[in-house]
Every structure is written in structure tokens, then in C-alpha cells.
């Protein structure tokens, strides 16, 4: 990207004065009008921000300048945070606060401009009026003073306006420079994303290095005259940015075309995303306006929906999905998200840029303002929401990928340990196989010796005419009687146990109810006692109050008595004084008047004092009487209340006593019932113990009877086997060699067919391998980092399969090559030699001896039709994840048609998605009996060769039958021909070697059963393919299909609301979980219902409800362990 970085000169340094400042102000006004010409700077969805910043930066006050600086600082801070996180594609917008700030500053700037314009007009009017008044009336000095004041104010306002315009222009230039830097950061982010997409797609990086943008020289002082040159500089930078964006758009379209060529259906995904979010189509050809935000939403929808048909996963697996290809599909969908989002984000501003350029060239200001208002709001909000959703989706993908990687590492460690165990088991099985072959030879010799003894004993019995038939009816009747008796005893014991359990449960329930009633009665008694104590306390309080009132009453009575005594004394004194007055009157009448006057005065004073005392005492007496009356009324009231309260308390006490007596009686009855129940429980427990002892004794008797019955059955089977062997040897001694010869011919022909089929499969595999390699090479050039590990795994599996097939063919060649040794048999067969030679020649060159092979095949088919009359055709198995073609007849059919039938049954009984590696041990089990047969043919006489070869063949047949889990003991018809003889021989050999622990089950089936018993997810991984974690995840997705609000993509965040657990358990236990009533908000209820439903069937909860409720991403291993336990309980 090229940018023009011109140094900004200080043009206004030489000039000064009012003229320059006025000119600068006019220029600033012009530049303010021309400010929409800088609209091409909005190439990356920032046209609204630029215009808002330009409008907001022209404020005329210091507050508006401060606000503009604050918005600029927040904008630069957001840009810095965006440069620190280049992976997240967030746009550098100043946010809603910045928009509100710019809108406020724009309003303030408009209002300041209007005030400035009005002040200038008013000042000019005042100046003209004052000039006229000076010329007309030079007398008025006051008018002159006003004119000078107005001139000074006008000059001051002009200077203030010029300064405010200068500061506003400087802030505007700073905002424009900050926006240009933010656009540089956005373009660098787009470049980094393009580079990441190239790395993810495996494209070679371009050798040519783009020119680094030169740093701008910071201007020390930016004056108002520099705004026009700065705008021109920004226009040139916008042109450079436009060219760079066009270049990036072309590169993105080229990448999109390549992705379309690779099979990514971009239009279908975009249409699906538009339908999902309700947006118009955002194809590259029709992208305009706010298509960037729509593109982001579309990519989010596509990432949620997953990979569509025809994606990279379909190209790699050909319709079979596995865990490894799931990783590839998720990564390719992430690549597609990056491409589409960047392309749509670049397509969208092109339309905006063209419209803004057309508006700057000739559009009216109304159109510019309408476009500015229409484009702001939707793009920022929608883009922020879509980017937030996309970041959340990327975090989910990252967590899922890390979870899958951890699970894969754990499974790899488990597989390494299993491989070591299987290697040790394979060595042990090889040793056991050698021991079995030796024991087979010994058993065949022993069987031959026993046959001779039985023949001798039978000849003796025939000579003496002794009947040696076994009384089977009596034994069978006795056995049936014992079995019927055992069934009856078991039924009776079970019935009695259920009855005793029912009685015990009933008694325990009754005991619990009695205990509850007792507890309630005790509570009632305690409550009544507490109430009684409370009443007693109230009674004591009332008694104390009554005593205090009585004491107060006594005191009042004493005071009244004292007052009455004092009143009587006063009356006596009054009478005495009256007498004295009468005497004094008499003395006055008789004697000196002066003395009498003095005495009268003294007496009058005494009288007044006595009257005052009398009135005072009278008042005190009245008060005392009123108090006594009040106290008497109060005392009467208290007496009445006390009597009422006492009666109520006595009634309540009587009721409480009656209730307590009743409760005591009930308690005694309950205690007696509890004692009776305990005695009954003890008796029942004694009876249960007796029944258990009787049952144990009966079980011992039954086990003894079963052991004796098994012994009798073994003896019976031994006798039957010996009789069958004697019958076959007496009647079919001459036909055994012909039968063996026909079987050997059939075996050779079938081995040849198997070899040709194996070669065809190898050819098909090599052809498919070559095609896959070509396809992988073609795709590997474009997505190397994604494909390398998966391709190595596929190659390793294919190579392992080829090596296994080659090893199996080598074992077959080794087993069949031994037959070319010179035979020392007394009866050589030229037909067998001819077949062996034809087989060897067919192994060296399949096309050279086609006639001999066809003749051998026809002869073998005829022999098979003669010997075996009813055989089931081998059905081809379904395709496995590693096999390119349907599996044909397994090589285990190379021994005889009967063994072919048994192996066909075992393969049909096996699981349909089992791999070929699980069936490899059966190849070696085939080659050993033939080798042993040919070795025995070189060392033994003809009769021993016939017997031992038949026994070895029957031994292999028996092992294969037991591996197919369909044991057939008694398949024998005395007069059934050669086929029946072979079947009887096989059962006899199987029973004779039943002492060996490994002869009853095929090692492959045994190892598989042990593996499934240890790890229940092994069968699931074989069924779905891929790792165990992905297989269990797909099983959960399959079980929860059709459930709403369920999207299982991992084992952590997909299970944090409990609905996934409820959905999985609802498929098995619908009565325990009301799924329609659940929601994702009530997490605790969801987890509680799910865990209770699982515990009701015996699945122990290993998760804590509190941790699950409060954790956004629970431990995926714990969740996977719990889900595994659910799968193990319901599916295994």
C-alpha cells in the first residue's frame, strides 16, 4: 500500500494581524463546507465516523474541543486494542458514546456558529447606526461611548471567533489523522487475515514485498491555513487505500473461485445464511451497502450449520464420515468463514465508497446527509453483534478441537497399551496353539487306543450275550423329577421371601407411623406443659399485684383513720377555742378593753390559723376518701378479673390434664404395639434365617445333584461318542480316504479362489490407493497443514491392511507349499498332486494355467456337491471403514465345506462394521491343521494318516464352530454317509479336547469380548468409525435428533444447561423426565431430574450439580465418563 506523506509547512508563520486571521477564518469556513469531499476515506465502513468527527470537531467553545479530544483519545485507544488482537476482526469504531459525543459537539458547533453570525450582524448594524448618529448628531457623547463599546465588543468577539475556529480546525485535523491511522490498522488487519487464509489454504506466499507506508512527519504547529492541504493529502491517501482495497478484493475473488473449484458451495451456504438471518443475498457480484455485516452473519450461520454436502470431508472420505474427517471439515469451514467474511467486508465499502465519491463530485448536500444518516446505525450494530457471535463460535470451535485432541491423545495411549497386551496375548496364543496341536496328536492316539479297547469289550459282550444298553429313560425321569423339585423349591422360597419382605415392610411402615404419632404426642405434651408453665407464671404475677394492691389499700385505710382522728381532735380544739372566746367576751364586758382587744387580736389570729388548718385537713380528707374509693374500685375490678382468670386457668388445666391422660394412654398402647411388632419382626427374622439355612441346604443338594447329573451326562456322552466312533469305523473304514481326498481337493480349490479374490482385493486396494494418493496430492497442494496428519493415518491404515493381507497370503502359501514334499504314503493320489501343482502354478502366474485351474475348480465343485448336500452360500459382508470393496468368503473356508458353513454363520453373527483386522487370527488357524495333516502324511502309515487327518480337520471345524457361538454337540446320523461321519468326528474331537481352556472359544472372539467388557466404546468406535470420543459424540447426536434447543458439539459447553442429559435419558426413560416442561434457564432442575432418573435405574452420578450449574465449561472428561456409563447401561 502506497501512501503520500508530505511535510506540512507553516504557511501562516510570516503573516499576522486581523486580515490574516479573518482570511484564515474564511478559509476555515470554506473548508468546513468542503469537508464532505474527504468522504472517500470511508472505504472500510467508516464514512459515518469521519463525517461525525468532522462535524463534531468544529465546535467553537473549549468544552466542545475537550469533547472532541476525548472522543479522539477513545478512538485511538480502541485502535490500539484492535492492533493487539489481530485475530479478532472487530472494526475500529468509536462506539455509541463516541457517536453521542460527536452529535453533541456538532449541535454545539452549529449553535456557536449561529451566535457568532448573529453577533457579527448585530455589531455591523450597530456600527452603521452609530456612524449615522455621529454625522447627524455630534452632540450626544453617550451614543459615541456606546459605539466605542460595541466596536470593542465586536473586535473581541471576532478575535474569540477566530481563536475558536482555529482550535476547532486543529481538532478536526487531529481527528482526521487519527481516523487515517485507524484505517491503516484495519488494512493491516485485513492483510494479516489474508496471509492467514493463504497459510491455511496452503497457497505460496507472494515473493514481492509490499512497500511499507512511510511514517508521516508530525507537524509541530498546525494552523488554520493548513487544513486545505491536509484535506488534499487525505484525499490522496484515500485514493491509495481504494486501490489497495480493490487489489485485496480481486485477490479474495480469486481465492473464492479456487474454493468453488474445490467444491465449496459458497452461494448455497450464503443463501442458507440469508434465509436464517432474514438478510438479502450477499453474493460477491451483488454486494453493496451494508453487505459486510450480512456477510459476517452469513459466515456465522454457516459455521453453526456445519459442513454442507460437497465439502472437503466428502472429497476425502467418499461418503463415509469419521472422527478425523470431522476435524478436517471443521477446519475447512473455518477457512471458508475467513474468506467469505473478509470478501464481504471488502465488497461492502466499495459500494459505499463509490456512492460517497459520486456525492463528493456532484451530489447535493441533502443527499449526502441522507446517505450519512441511512448508513449509520445498522452497519455498526449488526457488525458488532455478528462479530461477537463469530468470536463466540470461534471459541467454541477452539475448545471442541482441544477437547478432541486430548481425547485422541488418550485413545492413542490406550491403543498403544492394548497393542502391547495383544502382542503378549498373541505370543501366548501361539504357544498354546503348539501345545494344542501336540495334545491333539496325543488325544488322537489315545482315542485310537480307546477305540480298540471298546471294540474288544464289545466283542466280549457280544460273545456272552450281555445287553449293554443304557437305561436313559430312568435317568431322564430322575433328572426331570429333580429339576421339577428344584423349580418348586425355588418358587416356594421366592414366594415366601416376597411375603416376608412384604410383612417386614408393612411392619416397618407401621413402626414408622407409630413413631411419628409418638413424636407428635410428645410435641403436643411439651407444648401443653409449656403453656401450663406460662399460665402459672401469669398467676404468680397476678398474685403479687393483688398483694401489692392490698398493701396499698391498707395504707390508705390507715391514712383515712389518722385523718379522722386528726379531724376529731381539731373539732375538740375548736370547741375549746369557742369556750375561750366566750370567756374572753365575758371578761371584755367586765374588764379593761385594751387588754381585751389584744387578746381578741391574738385569738382572731389563732382562729384564722385553725380555720386554715381545718380547711386544709378537710381537703386532705376529701382527697383521701376519693383515693380510697378509687382504690376500692380498682381492687374490686382486680378481684373480678382474678376470679375469671382463675376459672379459665382451672378449666384449661383440667382440659390439659385430660389430654395428657389421653396421650399417655395412646402412648402406652403404641408402646405395646411397638413391642409386639418388634417381637413379630424378631420371629420373622428367625424364620427368614431358617428359610435361608433350608435354602442353602437345598442349594447344596441341588448342586450335588447337578454335579452327579453332569458326571452322568459326561459318561453318557463318552459312551455315545465311543459307540459312534465304533459304528463309523466298522461301516465307513473304506470310504474315509475318498472323503479326505475329496475334502482336500475342495480345500485346494477354495484356497485358490480365496487367493484370486485376495489378489483382486489387493489390486482394487492398490488402484484405490493410487487414486487416493493422486487426490491427496492434488488437495495437499492447497491444504497441506490440514491434510498431512489425516493422510498419514489413512496411509498407515491402508498399509497395515495390505501388510496383513500379504502376511495372510504368505501364511497360505507356506501352508500349501508344504504339500509339495514327496509323500511316503502307500497309496499316492495323482489327482491331489495335479491339483497342488495347478495351485502352485496359479500362484506364480494366474493367467498361464487358466485351463488347469478351471478343471480343478470344476472337479472341486463336483466333489463338494457329492460330499455336502446342504451348505449355505456365503453372503458378502457390508463395507467397513477400511475395506474398499465388500468382504468375500473368509480364508477360514479353506479346510472343508462344513467349516466354510460354520465360519459363514460366525461371520453373519458378528457385527456388520467389524474390520478385517479382527478376523486375521482365523487365517493362521486354517493353515496349521493343513500343515499338520501334510506332516502326518509323511510320517505315518495310510490308516493312521486317514484317522489323524480326519481328527485334525474335525478339530479345526469344532474350534471354528465354537467361535461362531453355535456349538452343536450331537450332529450325527449313523447312516448318513461321509458328511455325517465328518460331523460326528468333529464333535468327538471337540469333546475329547474340552480340558483345554482355549479350545472352546476363538482367540479373536475372546479378545473382542474381553475388549468390549473393558471398554464399552470399542464397539461404538467400530460402528461409527474414528475415535471413541467422536463415536460417542455421534451417538449422542443421533439419540437427541428431533429435540429442541439441543446442539451437541463437544462434552463441555454443550452439556452445561442439563438439557442434553435430559434428552438422552428421555429416549430411554420418558416417564421420569417431562422434557416439554424444561427450559435452559433452570439448570438445577434439569440436572436434578437427569441425575435422579439415572440413579433410579442404577447409574451412579459422578457429577456435582452445584459445579455443573455454576460452571460454564465443565470438565469434558467427567461429562464423557458419565455419558459413557449411560451408554454402557442402556446399550451394552
Swiss-Prot record:
Extent of Low complexity compositional bias: 73-109, 119-129, 348-377, 979-1000
Domain Calponin-homology (CH): residue ranges: 1026-1131
Region (Disordered): 1-166, 301-381, 869-895, 939-1016
Keyword Cytoplasm belongs to the record: yes
tRNA processing listed as a keyword: no
Listed Pro residues bias regions: 875-889
Signal peptide span: none
InterPro entries from the UniProt entry: CH_dom (IPR001715), CH_dom_sf (IPR036872), F-actin_Monoox_Mical (IPR050540)
Location, primary (coarse class): cytoplasm
Keywords carried by this UniProt record: Cell cycle, Cell division, Cell junction, Coiled coil, Cytoplasm, Cytoskeleton, Gap junction
Single GO biological process annotation from the record: cell division
Compositionally biased residues, Polar residues: 333-343, 946-961
Compositional bias annotation for Basic and acidic residues: 150-159, 962-972
Family as reported in the entry's similarity comment: Belongs to the cytospin-A family.
Subunit structure: May interact with both microtubules and actin cytoskeleton.
Alphabetized PANTHER family for the sequence: CALPONIN HOMOLOGY DOMAIN-CONTAINING PROTEIN DDB_G0272472-RELATED (PTHR23167), CYTOSPIN-A (PTHR23167:SF18)
Protein name from the UniProt record: Cytospin-A
Source species of the chain: Danio rerio
Gene responsible for this protein: specc1la
Amino acid at each position: 500500500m502506497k501512501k503520500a506523506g508530505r511535510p506540512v509547512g507553516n504557511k501562516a508563520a510570516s503573516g499576522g494581524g486581523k486580515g490574516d486571521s479573518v482570511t484564515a477564518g474564511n478559509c476555515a469556513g470554506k473548508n468546513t463546507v468542503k469537508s464532505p469531499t474527504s468522504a472517500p476515506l470511508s472505504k472500510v465502513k467508516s464514512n459515518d465516523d469521519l463525517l461525525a468527527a468532522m462535524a463534531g470537531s468544529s465546535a467553537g467553545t473549549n468544552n466542545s474541543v475537550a469533547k472532541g479530544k476525548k472522543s479522539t483519545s477513545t478512538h485511538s485507544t480502541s485502535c490500539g486494542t484492535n492492533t493487539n488482537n489481530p485475530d479478532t476482526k472487530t472494526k475500529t469504531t468509536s462506539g455509541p458514546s463516541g457517536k453521542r459525543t460527536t452529535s453533541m459537539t456538532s449541535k454545539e458547533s452549529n449553535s456557536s456558529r449561529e451566535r457568532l453570525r448573529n453577533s457579527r450582524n448585530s455589531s455591523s448594524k450597530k456600527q452603521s447606526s452609530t456612524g449615522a448618529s455621529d454625522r447627524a448628531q455630534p452632540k450626544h457623547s453617550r451614543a459615541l461611548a456606546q459605539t466605542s463599546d460595541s466596536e470593542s465588543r465586536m473586535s473581541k468577539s471576532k478575535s474569540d471567533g477566530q481563536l475558536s475556529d482555529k482550535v476547532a480546525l486543529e481538532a478536526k485535523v487531529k481527528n482526521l489523522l487519527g481516523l487515517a491511522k485507524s484505517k491503516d490498522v484495519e488494512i493491516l488487519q485485513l492483510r494479516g487475515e489474508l496471509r492467514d487464509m493463504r497459510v491455511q489454504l496452503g497457497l505460496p506466499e507472494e515473493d514481492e514485498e509490499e512497500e511499507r507506508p512511510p511514517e508521516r512527519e508530525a507537524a509541530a504547529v498546525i494552523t488554520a491555513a493548513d487544513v486545505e492541504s491536509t484535506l488534499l493529502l487525505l484525499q490522496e491517501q484515500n485514493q491509495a487505500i481504494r486501490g489497495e482495497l480493490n487489489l485485496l478484493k480481486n485477490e479474495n475473488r480469486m481465492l473464492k473461485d479456487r474454493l468453488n473449484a474445490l467444491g465449496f458451495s459458497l452461494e448455497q451456504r450464503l443463501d442458507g445464511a440469508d434465509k436464517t438471518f432474514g438478510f438479502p443475498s450477499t453474493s460477491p457480484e451483488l454486494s453493496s451497502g451494508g453487505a459486510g455485516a450480512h456477510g459476517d452473519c452469513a459466515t456465522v450461520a454457516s459455521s453453526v450449520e456445519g459442513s454442507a454436502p460437497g465439502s472437503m470431508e466428502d472429497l476425502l472420505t467418499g461418503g463415509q464420515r469419521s472422527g478425523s474427517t470431522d476435524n478436517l471439515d471443521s477446519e475447512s469451514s473455518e477457512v471458508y468463514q475467513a474468506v467469505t467474511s473478509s470478501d464481504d467486508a471488502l465488497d461492502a465499502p466499495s459500494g459505499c465508497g463509490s456512492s460517497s465519491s459520486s456525492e463528493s463530485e456532484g451530489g447535493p448536500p441533502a443527499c449526502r446527509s441522507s446517505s450519512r444518516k441511512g448508513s449509520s446505525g445498522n452497519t455498526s450494530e449488526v457488525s458488532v453483534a455478528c462479530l461477537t457471535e463469530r468470536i463466540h463460535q470461534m471459541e467454541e470451535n477452539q475448545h471442541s478441537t482441544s477437547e478432541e485432541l486430548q481425547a485422541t491423545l488418550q485413545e492413542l495411549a490406550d491403543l498403544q497399551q492394548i497393542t502391547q497386551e495383544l502382542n503378549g496375548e498373541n505370543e501366548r496364543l501361539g504357544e498354546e496353539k503348539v501345545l494344542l496341536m501336540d495334545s491333539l496328536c496325543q488325544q488322537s492316539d489315545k482315542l485310537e487306543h480307546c477305540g480298540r479297547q471298546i471294540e474288544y469289550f464289545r466283542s466280549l459282550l457280544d460273545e456272552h450275550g450281555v445287553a449293554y444298553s443304557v437305561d436313559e429313560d430312568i435317568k431322564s425321569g430322575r433328572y426331570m423329577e429333580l429339576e421339577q423339585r428344584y423349580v418348586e423349591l425355588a418358587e416356594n422360597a421366592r414366594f415366601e421371601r416376597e411375603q416376608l419382605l412384604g410383612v417386614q415392610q408393612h411392619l416397618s411402615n407401621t413402626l414408622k407411623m407409630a413413631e411419628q404419632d409418638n413424636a407428635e404426642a410428645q410435641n403436643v405434651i411439651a407444648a401443653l406443659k409449656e403453656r401450663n408453665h406460662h399460665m402459672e407464671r401469669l398467676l404468680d404475677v397476678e398474685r403479687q399485684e393483688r398483694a401489692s394492691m392490698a398493701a396499698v389499700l391498707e395504707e390508705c385505710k390507715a391514712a383515712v383513720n389518722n385523718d379522722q382522728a386528726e379531724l376529731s381532735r381539731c373539732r375538740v380544739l375548736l370547741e375549746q377555742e369557742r369556750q375561750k372566746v366566750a370567756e374572753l367576751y365575758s371578761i371584755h364586758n367586765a374588764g379593761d378593753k385594751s387588754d381585751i382587744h389584744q387578746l381578741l387580736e391574738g385569738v382572731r389570729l389563732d382562729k384564722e390559723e385553725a380555720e386554715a388548718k381545718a380547711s386544709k385537713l378537710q381537703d386532705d380528707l376529701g382527697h383521701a376518701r376519693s383515693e380510697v374509693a378509687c382504690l376500692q374500685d380498682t381492687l374490686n375490678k382486680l378481684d373480678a378479673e382474678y376470679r375469671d382468670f382463675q376459672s379459665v386457668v382451672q378449666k384449661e388445666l383440667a382440659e390439659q390434664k385430660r389430654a395428657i391422660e389421653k396421650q399417655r394412654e395412646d402412648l402406652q398402647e403404641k408402646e405395646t404395639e411397638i413391642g409386639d411388632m418388634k417381637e413379630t419382626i424378631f420371629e420373622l427374622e428367625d424364620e427368614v434365617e431358617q428359610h435361608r439355612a433350608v435354602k442353602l441346604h437345598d442349594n447344596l443338594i441341588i448342586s450335588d445333584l447337578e454335579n452327579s447329573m453332569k458326571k452322568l451326562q459326561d459318561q453318557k456322552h463318552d459312551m455315545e461318542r465311543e459307540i459312534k466312533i465304533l459304528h463309523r469305523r466298522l461301516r465307513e473304514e473304506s470310504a474315509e480316504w475318498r472323503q479326505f481326498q475329496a475334502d482336500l481337493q475342495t480345500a485346494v480349490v477354495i484356497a485358490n479362489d480365496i487367493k484370486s479374490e485376495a489378489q483382486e482385493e489387493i489390486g482394487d486396494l492398490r488402484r484405490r490407493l493410487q487414486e487416493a494418493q493422486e487426490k491427496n496430492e492434488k488437495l495437499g497442494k492447497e491444504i497441506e497443514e490440514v491434510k498431512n496428519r489425516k493422510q498419514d493415518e489413512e496411509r498407515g491404515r491402508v498399509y497395515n491392511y495390505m501388510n496383513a493381507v500379504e502376511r495372510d497370503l504368505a501364511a497360505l502359501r507356506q501352508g500349501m507349499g508344504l504339500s509339495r514334499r514327496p509323500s511316503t504314503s502307500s497309496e499316492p493320489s495323482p489327482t491331489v498332486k495335479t491339483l497342488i501343482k495347478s495351485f502352485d502354478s496359479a500362484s506364480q502366474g494366474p493367467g498361464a494355467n487358466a485351463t488347469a485351474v478351471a478343471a480343478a475348480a470344476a472337479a472341486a465343485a463336483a466333489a463338494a456337491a457329492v460330499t455336502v448336500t446342504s451348505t449355505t452360500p456365503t453372503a458378502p459382508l457390508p463395507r467397513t471403514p477400511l475395506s474398499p470393496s465388500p468382504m468375500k468368503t473368509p480364508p477360514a473356508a479353506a479346510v472343508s465345506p462344513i467349516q466354510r458353513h460354520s465360519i459363514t454363520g460366525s461371520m453373519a453373527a458378528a457385527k456388520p462394521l467389524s474390520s478385517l483386522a479382527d478376523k486375521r487370527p482365523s487365517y493362521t488357524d486354517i493353515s496349521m491343521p493343513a500343515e499338520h495333516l501334510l506332516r502326518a502324511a509323511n510320517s505315518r502309515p495310510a490308516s493312521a494318516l486317514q484317522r489323524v487327518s480326519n481328527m485334525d480337520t474335525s478339530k479345526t471345524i469344532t474350534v471354528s464352530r465354537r467361535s461362531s457361538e453355535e456349538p452343536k454337540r450331537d450332529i450325527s446320523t449313523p447312516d448318513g454317509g461321509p458328511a455325517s461321519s465328518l460331523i460326528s468326528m468333529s464333535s468327538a474331537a471337540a469333546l475329547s479336547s474340552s480340558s483345554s481352556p482355549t479350545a472352546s472359544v476363538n482367540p479373536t472372539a475372546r479378545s473382542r469380548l474381553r475388549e468390549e467388557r473393558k471398554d464399552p466404546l470399542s464397539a461404538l468406535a467400530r460402528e461409527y468409525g474414528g475415535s471413541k470420543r467422536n463415536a460417542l459424540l455421534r451417538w449422542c447426536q443421533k439419540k437427541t435428533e428431533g429435540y429442541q434447543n439441543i446442539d451437541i458439539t463437544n462434552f463441555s459447553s454443550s452439556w452445561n444447561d442439563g438439557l442434553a442429559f435430559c434428552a438422552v435419558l428421555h429416549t430411554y426413560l420418558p416417564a421420569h423426565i417431562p422434557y416439554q416442561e424444561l427450559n435452559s434457564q433452570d439448570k438445577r432442575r434439569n440436572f436434578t431430574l437427569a441425575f435422579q432418573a439415572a440413579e433410579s435405574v442404577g447409574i451412579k452420578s459422578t457429577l456435582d450439580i452445584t459445579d455443573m450449574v455454576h460452571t460454564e465449561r465443565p470438565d469434558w472428561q467427567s461429562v464423557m465418563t458419565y455419558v459413557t456409563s449411560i451408554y454402557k447401561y442402556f446399550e451394552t
